[in-house]
Every structure is written in C-alpha cells, then in structure tokens.
Amino acid sequence: MTPFTTALLFAVLVAQAAQTQAPEIPIAPGVIFVLAVSNDTSSTGAPAGILQGDSELVVAITDTTGGITHAASFEGRDASGVERRGIVRRVVSAADLATARVQILGFHVDDPAAVAGTSALGPSLAVTRELVQEGVTAYSFRNWVSRETISGTLKRTSSGTVKFPVLINGRRVELEAVQATGVLVLGNARRPFEMLILDHPRYPISLRVAYGPRDGGFPFKPDFAREVVRIDFPTTGNTIAEGLAKDCRVELRGIYFDFNEATIKPQSEAALKEIASALKTSPQGRLRLEGHTDNIGSDRYNDELSARRAEAVKAALVRDHGLDAPRLMTAGHGERRPVETNDTLAGRARNRRVELVCADR
C-alpha cells in the first residue's frame, strides 16, 4: 500500500468516525428530551393516575440559572381523580444536581415545583460518580413526589459501557451508557431494577429505567420502563429545506402529541416556527404531511389517528404561521410504513411520527 493510499484510507476512516460520533448534548434552554414510557401493571392493578400501555413524556429545559428548570408534559389523573393534561414545572437546584440521593422519575400535576434532596431526569452527579468510580452506589427513587421512596443498592454490570441508540435531532446515534442493576426495596416488596446512565459532566441522564414485578428476579418483564428515544435542540442550518432538496422527504422532528390524540403539545411550538420558516423560503411546490403510528390498536384506529395528526400539523402551520392551505396536503399511513421494529418500546416510539414529502413527485 502506497503512502498516498494509506493516507486516503485513514482520511476515509476518520470521516466515517466523525459521521457516527455522538454530538455533544447541550444542557441549555430549548433542549427537549422525549421519553417513551410503558406501564404494564395488569397483574397487580393500576395505581390511580397511571396511564397503562405506551405513552410519551416530553421534557424541555427552560432555564439553567442556579440549577435546571424543566417543563414536562402531563397526561393522567390528579389526586381527586379528575383527568388532567398540561405542563408540570420542576426545578432541580445546583446543590441537588450535585448531591441529591433520591431521583423522582415522573412529573405529576399535583407535585410541587421544587423538592429538596431530589433529582429529575437522572441521578445526581455524586450518585453517578460513585457508580462509575466504585462500581456500586446507594440509590433511591420515587415515581412521583407523593409516592413512597424505593431504595436499594445499584451495582455496575461491567467496567465498560453499553451502546444505547437515541435520535438526536433526527439522526440515530449510539450513546455510551453506564449500566447498573439491583434489587430495590419498599417495605416487604422487592423489585428487580435496571438503569442505563449517560454520564454527562453537567447532568447525568437516565437513558433507560425499568423495574419488574414484586419479588421478581432477573431477567424480568418490566412493570414499568422509561427510555429516552429523542433529544432535540436548536441547531444552525435549514435541515428541513436540505432534506427536501436531497430526498424530497424529511421527518419533522420536534412535533409532539398528547397520548392517543392529535392534540399538539406546547413544546412543539419552536419546531412549528422552524418548519414554517423553512417552507416559506423553500422552492418546493406542493407538499404532503404524512402521519404514521406504531402497531398498537386496530388498523382503522391507527389510520384515523395518523391522518388526524397530519391534519393537526397542517392546521397549526396555516392558522398560526401563515402558510397557504392549498400548498399542503395530508395523508395517514397508520402502521404500514414503520422505520423500526414495533417489538420494542423505543421502536414503537420512533414509528410514531409525521413526515413532510414533495407531493409533485
């Protein structure tokens, strides 16, 4: 192999590595984490307020002054049994981000905005450091602020990391995660527990949390599982226009819907503005918004839901952002065009999407 060939091969390998390298995830206002959540407590009974089956939790960082302020979607029942939907604010102070011993996994409409001694999207820096450096740590969590604290010991499964796929700004990236398991205890109940942690220097993130049934062992079918499936944050460049120009098809990242509904969540507003701005300057002619679902539910239900979600995006773009209605068509494809397997929680979440395609091709 000549020196020129060697140099060329090295350059190609470096370029390929750069394409798959995980981008730095900022901890700043405007960053949005989308978490797929699955509850299956059919064998033990569903606690009040907990949605059964798949749902999504959308958490935006809104402020990083003196800690981290979150704005999270809520869909469920309040303490009085009334069904509620809205935004829940949660503040984690800088001190708690550093040293808190309890992680609150969920965001409930009845919860106070700040709870001393607790973290939110991930364990504290101190808990994470103990796990990474010593291989073991004491860990506690609550599902919501008002729920009981469940505690135990987490042990790192190996000295290395495992790869965990996440869509970051629409691009599939494999993040390096620290894996830990343990048996956590509440009273006489013991539950197997697993967590995968992104060891972020500013804010460790629980990429996956799962626990099994009472007195269950490993491996286990989760009663509860939560996985980060998307991370969206503002970037430079017009990715929508670039995607249309290249492939005449682009997935609209940053559009989030209420559980089993076509109601667009408030955290979608920044994405809607970006889409409208891109389309107003795009040379493309007529465009079609296409809705897609997972395979949970009947074919008819999924067809109707996907069509209603595409219509909802069109309505928002026309009503709130001044796009011409005749330029936008809509279609619903239900579960028929998956991009990933429907056999996993993350795969089903990624199949629930809206795409924009050129209608004249």
Kindly give the residue locations of the regions a language model identified.
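Beta-strand/loop-rich accessory regions of lumenal/periplasmic or secreted enzymes
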Residues: 93-150
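Extracytoplasmic
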Residues: 175, 204, 252, 284, ...
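Periplasmic peptidoglycan-binding/tethering modules of Gram-negative envelope proteins
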Residues: 216, 220-287, 322, 361
